[in-house]
Every structure is written in C-alpha cells, then in structure tokens.
C-alpha cells in the first residue's frame, strides 16, 4: 500500500541511537559553494565497444570526469558555483534493497536544503512503478527522522523491474516533465544504472531539462570498475553474513559431525562469498569465477569436495563449512547450457511440464540426472535481465546431495573408511539485506547523496556519483562523478564459426578478479583454511569501539584510487607542458620525445593486452 510508505517507524533503543548518528562529510562537500573541475573526456574501457557505445549514446558518451574540490584547492580552471536556485529533484529506489539506501536520500535532502531551503525532494513510491505512475511523497526532515541510518527501502518502497521498454522510458520522461524536475536520482545496481544512462540519453535527445544521476547501491558488490571501488550495502551484507557463518563454524567445531553447505546471495559474481571467506575463514569456498575459468563440471566440483572431505577424515575431522555463491549454478558450463535451452523454450511459451521432452538429447540427459527439487527450480521463468532466479535455486542442496551420494559410494567400495557423511544446508541473504547499515555504509551512502546534489548543481547529466580512496578516513575521500557511458561494455557472442552476435551497451556485473590481491590472499590461505579449522568470528556488527571502523577486506587489500591517479597523471602532464614549450633547449625536446615515444609504445601494448582479457560476466 502506498499509504504505508514514509510513515514513522517504531524504533528500538539501538535504532534510536543510530538515528542520531551524523555521518562525516569530506572537506570538498562542506560549505555552500560547489567547486568542480572537469577533466578530459572519457572513453569506454574497451576500444572494441567504444564505437557501438558512442552510437547508442551520442549525447552522453565522451563526457569529462568531474572532481569536486575543497575550498583551499588551487585549480585555475575550476568552476565555482555559489548561486543555488531552488531545485526540484526526484529520487527512486530501483532493484533489491541494500543497507544504507536511506542515507543516500538523507544526504541528498540535506544537501538540497543546505544550498537552498526552498528546494524540494520528491520520492517516488514503489520504485520504478511509482516513477511511471507519478506517485510521489515529498521527503522532509520529519519523514526522514526514523529512517536515518536504518536498513531497508521502506521509506519509499522499491521494484526490481527494469526501465527498459519504450513505453516505460517515455512514461519516466512524461513524469519528469509534468513534475518539472531539475534532477532524477536513481539508486540501484548494474541494471538500474544502465537504465539511468538510457534515461539520461533519452532526456538529452528530447531536450528535457531533467538531469539523471545514478548511485551505486547494491548488496552484490558487482558494480565495480575503475571509477567505483565498492557499493553501498556490500560492507553490511558481508559483516552480517560473516557473523552467521562464523557462528555455524563454531557449531561445526563443537559437534564435529556435520558439513554445512552455505549459499550466499550476490547474483552472478562471487564478491560476497570471497569477502565473507576472508572475514570468517570457513574450510572451503567455491567461487563461480574459478569454476567458469577452469570449466569445471558438476562432477568435477563433487569430486573436489569429496576429496576435501576424505582428506579431513584422514585427520579424524568429520565436520566443515563450505561457502557457495548463488551464481555458482550459472558458472557450471553444462548447467548454464541447460538453463539457456530451458529459458529459450519458456520464452517460446512452452509449458514447464513439457520442457523436458523438447530439450536436446544431452540437455535432457543432464536434466533427468538431477534430483526433482532442482528440476523444478531450473524451470522457473528467468529474471528481467535474462538470468536464472538464482535465489530460488538451491545449489547448496544439490551439491550436498551429490557429495553424499559419492561419499556413500566410496564407503561401499572401501576407498573411504571414515564415518558417514552428514550435511546441513543454509541460504544466507534475506537475513542480512534488511540489517542496520554499518558505519561505513552510513557514511558512504550519505556522502554519495551529497555528491548527487553537486552533480546536479554542476548541470551534469548521465553521471554516477563516486567516492574513491575509500579505504582511508572520510576526510581523505575523493568525491566526483563519472559518465555512466564510460563504465559500459558490449558483449560479443560467437554464435557459430564466422558469425558474431553483438549485445547492447550496458554496465555488466564485474567478476571477481582472479589476478587480484584479494583472490591472491584467499589462495595463499586456502590449504590452511581447509585443513586447520582457523575459524574466525568477527562478532555482530559494531557501531562504536573496536571493529566499528572496519571496512571490507577486499576493498582494503586492493590498490585502487583510480581518480587520484588520474589527477596525479594530469599534474605530470601539466609539468611536461610547462617544461617543454617553444624555446626550450634541443636536449630537453629530444629527451621529451624519446621518453614519450617509449611511454606510448608501452601503454599501447598494455592497453590492447588488458582489453583483450577484460570479460565482464
């Protein structure tokens, strides 16, 4: 019911305490003057897709990076905006709820009111459906009072539908025109921000004055690229899940007779599973990216787990904890191919009851091999982004079932001489995504809300609010905005020899980097985690004292700060221009040419190599 949105919440004592917490702002967002430096024009990270993206987004592709500056910064060509006319801005939650989303709204509201008390923030009720139907709630400080630093999306509600069809895009355009909006802020993940880019392009084409800004909020942690280090909600989800996992680890060690198979929410990528493993040290994690890269079959995975169980049994250990990402099922080559066939038939209108008889022989054989509960789940209609309904497919039960069958077989054959294998299965996801957000997510979301205002004040359209250098204290965060089109890639599929299918430009989920430092840390400890029971319990989410300022391990071990390095490069280039100018000596000119030629050759080689290897999910 729309009438339920925005009503005051009944708060516990802890919630009341959290509602009083005021997130810190970086220096560049303080005060009432917006200082923005626009850098060089951006390009797509893949040269092969740049042409396709530029054709699809002629008005918003190639826009410059925006850096917001502190008052003491001395930048000659900075734009200083001190006049702030009243604005009308709309905000909408798209996609699944993620802890911290409410603080984006709070930060945006505060920034609007600080710069002009007459500005208005309208929240669309019920997500994208409310956007299409022009259902709004004026967000006020009174309404926000019981939602500050709180979990969920119940302030405004949400939908998970895409803004995809021509009718939906035009409905959004009509809404923004009718409500005379200066800005529209879309809060969501990869799909929602792809939609934001499309809306921005459509609005620019239609000469609609509404500027569209995206905010990276998703528990999956898969909206990562050179501009976005992590997502709002990821820290909270991983901390809450890690506590649950570590509790299970302690239980396993106490009873010493169960193997726990735990599936974690997170869609196609395995970021949540990787982070939770580094925080809680379970015996084993199976990452979807590893499985896809090694082309491991269902039987390979079963053998891998069984061999681990047998190795532990030889040390008289009959317990363990194994983590699986929910996207694992789509990473197994033969199961992925089966799902593609099933989804194709479902889209053709074939009844689920008749699917099995219309599968290809090999797909039919695999389908018939699977236990009945998995068959039923694989027949579910796919999501709007064409992926399987991953949260509904009990991969943990499938793997436990196959491992149990194989261990019983080994026991019968005499190749395994240990105790009977016992499995217990869990799915962690819904338990965490409505949690009170962590201190980091509260700060990060609030800062991004303020950045949204700065983006709109600078008149930028088709941008995503960004904060980088996040592993450092808030006062060292770099605030800016990047064109969403620069984050896009274009998928290509080899349909058959000599024929390639090209997809639409989109932000694709970022996979776990199997060459990254976080994965390297996991591999370094994998054998010890498997055999030595080094279970680690981070405890409940902390808001004060030890642990309150902890950030995701995967964020802290990676050396990111792309925006900072872009600024540093610009400083070096400016120095070169200062030194090498008409009138400089021959020696200086020759040295500059020699160095530049070498640098250019190296960068061209590195660029082509890295782009060839970049494969989004």
From Swiss-Prot:
Gene Ontology molecular functions: 6-phosphofructokinase activity; ATP binding; diphosphate-fructose-6-phosphate 1-phosphotransferase activity; metal ion binding
Pfam family for this entry, one: PFK
Pathway connected to this protein: Carbohydrate degradation; glycolysis; D-glyceraldehyde 3-phosphate and glycerone phosphate from D-glucose: step 3/4
Highest taxon, organism lineage: Eukaryota
Physiological role: Regulatory subunit of pyrophosphate--fructose 6-phosphate 1-phosphotransferase.
Description of how activity is regulated: Allosterically activated by fructose 2,6-bisphosphate.
Protein name: Pyrophosphate--fructose 6-phosphate 1-phosphotransferase subunit alpha
Cited HAMAP family: Phosphofructokinase_II_Long (MF_01980)
InterPro entries reported for this sequence: PfpB_PPi_PFK (IPR011183), Phosphofructokinase_dom (IPR000023), PKF_sf (IPR035966)
Family statement drawn from the similarity comment of this UniProt entry: Belongs to the phosphofructokinase type A (PFKA) family. PPi-dependent PFK group II subfamily. Clade 'Long' sub-subfamily.
Keywords from the UniProt entry: Allosteric enzyme, Cytoplasm, Glycolysis, Kinase, Magnesium, Metal-binding, Transferase
Cell location: Cytoplasm
Keyword Amino-acid biosynthesis: no
Species annotation: Ricinus communis
Subunit structure: Tetramer of two alpha (regulatory) and two beta (catalytic) chains.
Xref: SUPFAM superfamilies: Phosphofructokinase (SSF53784)
Predominant location: cytoplasm
Record's GO cellular component terms: cytoplasm
PANTHER family: PYROPHOSPHATE--FRUCTOSE 6-PHOSPHATE 1-PHOSPHOTRANSFERASE (PTHR43650), PYROPHOSPHATE--FRUCTOSE 6-PHOSPHATE 1-PHOSPHOTRANSFERASE SUBUNIT ALPHA 1 (PTHR43650:SF17)
């Amino acid at each position: 019911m729309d009438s339920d949105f925005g009503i005051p919440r009944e708060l516990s004592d802890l919630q009341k305490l959290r509602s009083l917490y005021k997130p810190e702002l970086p220096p560049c967002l303080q005060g009432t003057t917006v200082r923005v430096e626009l850098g060089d024009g951006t390009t797509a990270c893949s040269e092969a897709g740049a042409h396709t993206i530029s054709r699809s987004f002629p008005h918003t592709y190639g826009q410059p990076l925006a850096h917001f500056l502190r008052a003491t910064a001395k930048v000659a060509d900075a734009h200083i905006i001190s006049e702030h006319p009243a604005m009308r801005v709309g905000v909408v939650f798209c996609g699944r709820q993620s802890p911290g989303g409410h603080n984006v709204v709070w930060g945006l509201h505060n920034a609007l009111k600080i710069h002009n008390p007459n500005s208005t923030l309208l929240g669309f009720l019920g997500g994208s459906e409310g956007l299409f139907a022009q259902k709004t709630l004026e967000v006020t400080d009174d309404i926000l009072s019981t939602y500050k630093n709180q979990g969920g999306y119940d302030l405004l509600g949400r939908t998970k539908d895409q803004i995809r069809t021509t009718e939906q895009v035009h409905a959004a355009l009509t809404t923004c025109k009718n409500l005379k909006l200066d800005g529209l802020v879309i809060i969501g993940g990869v799909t929602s921000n792809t939609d934001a880019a499309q809306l921005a392009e459509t609005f620019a084409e239609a000469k609609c004055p509404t500027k569209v800004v995206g905010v990276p909020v998703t528990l999956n942690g898969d909206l990562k690229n050179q501009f976005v280090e992590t997502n709002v909600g990821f820290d909270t989800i991983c901390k809450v899940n890690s506590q649950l996992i570590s509790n299970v680890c302690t239980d396993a060690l106490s009873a010493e007779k169960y193997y726990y198979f735990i599936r974690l929410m997170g869609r196609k990528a395995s970021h949540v599973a990787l982070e939770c493993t580094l925080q809680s040290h379970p015996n084993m994690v199976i990452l979807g990216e590893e499985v896809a890269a090694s082309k491991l079959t269902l039987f390979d995975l079963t053998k891998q787990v069984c061999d681990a169980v047998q190795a532990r049994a030889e040390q008289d250990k009959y317990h363990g904890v194994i983590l699986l990402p929910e996207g694992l099922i789509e990473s197994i080559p033969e199961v992925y191919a089966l799902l593609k066939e099933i989804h194709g038939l479902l889209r053709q209108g074939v009844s689920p009851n008749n699917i099995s008889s219309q599968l290809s022989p090999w797909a039919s054989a695999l389908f018939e091999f699977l236990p009945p509960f998995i068959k039923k789940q694989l027949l579910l209609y796919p999501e709007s982004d064409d992926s399987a309904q991953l949260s509904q497919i009990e991969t943990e039960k499938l793997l436990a079932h196959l491992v149990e069958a194989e261990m019983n077989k080994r026991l019968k054959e005499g190749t395994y001489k240990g105790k009977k294998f016992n499995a217990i299965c869990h799915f962690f996801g819904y338990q965490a995504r409505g949690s009170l957000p962590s201190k980091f997510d509260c700060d990060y979301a609030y800062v991004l809300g303020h950045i949204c205002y700065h983006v709109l004040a600078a008149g930028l359209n088709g941008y995503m609010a960004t904060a980088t250098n996040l592993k450092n204290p808030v006062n060292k965060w770099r605030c800016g905005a990047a064109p969403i089109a620069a984050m896009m890639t274009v998928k290509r599929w080899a349909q058959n020899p000599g024929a390639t299918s090209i997809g639409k430009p989109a932000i694709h989920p970022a996979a776990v980097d199997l060459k990254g430092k976080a994965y390297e840390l996991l591999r370094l400890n994998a054998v010890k985690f498997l055999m030595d029971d080094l279970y680690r319990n981070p405890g409940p989410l902390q808001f004060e004292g030890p642990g309150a300022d902890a950030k995701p391990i995967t964020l802290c071990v990676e050396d990111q700060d792309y925006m900072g390095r872009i600024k540093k490069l610009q400083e070096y280039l400016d120095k070169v221009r200062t030194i090498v100018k008409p009138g400089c000596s021959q020696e200086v000119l020759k040295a500059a040419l020699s160095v530049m030629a070498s640098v250019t050759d190296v960068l061209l080689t590195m660029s082509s190599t890295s782009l060839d290897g970049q494969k989004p999910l």
